[in-house]
């Protein structure tokens, strides 16, 4: 009787047994993955286009926004009887030779005055030219303006466009500090359908770009002085919870 002896393991390879997923597992993984993708696609725009106003006496609008946002800001101002409408914005970066206004704050304020049906206390708050972090620089300029008037208000509401809202609120809150609560109103971007943003190039560029920009602002952003001669010290980064 010949006894079979197992082949000894080789020098370079050896046999192993391993478990692999069955087709049922792959189907479940596919369904879960598709559900996750769908959740991101349908949920990212509502997440970014945050609307959460507070009871405030001061309304702020970003001066670079289009006419629909400006009209909505005027409607909000009249409906809730604010005392002041402030317009933020840095230098106009194109067509300066054809534009009578040096900054978006001044341009936006003039635009609002033309739109208003009666006299509204509109004040432009220009920001200096910067190479990066323009939204934050306009928020710092607003903080400096408040301090020159006396002290920042306890609450403000900020009006901006679509998915820019959550990032704007975060950066304005960082710049103004915890002494001022920042409410936010997001006005739909007329360039794309917010419920089907992925069907247009404008929607894809805007939503994906704003998501990446918000992720950077919420995790990596470190403020730097916006001008060498700033008389007001910049606040340290204190990112509020839930932004």
What do these predicted ranges mean?
Residues 64, 79, 212-213, 242:
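Bulky hydrophobic/aromatic packing residues
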Residues 200-227:
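A transmembrane-helix-recognition feature enriched in membrane-embedded lipid enzymes
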Residues 10-50:
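N-terminal type II signal-anchor transmembrane helix
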Residues 16-21, 197, 201, 205:
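Juxtamembrane/transmembrane-helix boundary motifs in multi-pass membrane proteins
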Residues 45-199:
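A structural signal for short, hydrophobic/glycine-enriched beta-strand patches
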Residues 1-10:
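N-terminal intrinsically disordered, acidic low-complexity segments at the extreme N-terminus
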Residues 224-243:
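Short linear elements at protein peripheries
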């Amino acid at each position: 009787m010949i006894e079979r002896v197992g082949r000894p393991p080789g020098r370079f390879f050896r046999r192993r047994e391993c478990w692999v997923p069955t087709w049922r597992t792959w189907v479940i993984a596919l369904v879960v993955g598709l559900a996750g993708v769908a959740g991101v696609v349908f949920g990212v725009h509502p997440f970014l286009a945050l609307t959460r106003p507070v009871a405030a006496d001061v309304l702020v609008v970003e001066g670079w926004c289009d006419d629909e946002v400006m009209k909505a800001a005027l409607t909000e101002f009249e409906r809730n009887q604010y005392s002041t409408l402030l317009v933020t914005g840095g230098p106009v970066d194109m067509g300066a030779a054809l534009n009578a206004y040096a900054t978006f704050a001044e341009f936006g304020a003039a635009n609002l005055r033309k739109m208003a049906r009666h006299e509204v206390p509109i004040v432009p708050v220009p920001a200096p030219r910067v190479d990066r972090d323009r939204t934050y620089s306009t928020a710092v300029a607003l903080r400096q303006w408040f301090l020159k008037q006396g002290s920042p208000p306890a609450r403000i509401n900020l009006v901006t466009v679509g998915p820019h809202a959550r990032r704007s609120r975060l950066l304005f809150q960082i710049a103004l500090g915890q002494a001022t609560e920042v409410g936010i109103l997001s006005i739909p971007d007329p360039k794309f359908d917010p419920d089907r943003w992925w069907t247009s190039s404008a929607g894809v560029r805007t939503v994906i770009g704003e998501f990446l920009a918000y992720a950077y602002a919420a995790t990596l952003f470190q403020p730097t002085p916006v001008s060498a001669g700033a008389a007001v010290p910049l606040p340290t980064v204190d990112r509020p919870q839930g932004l």
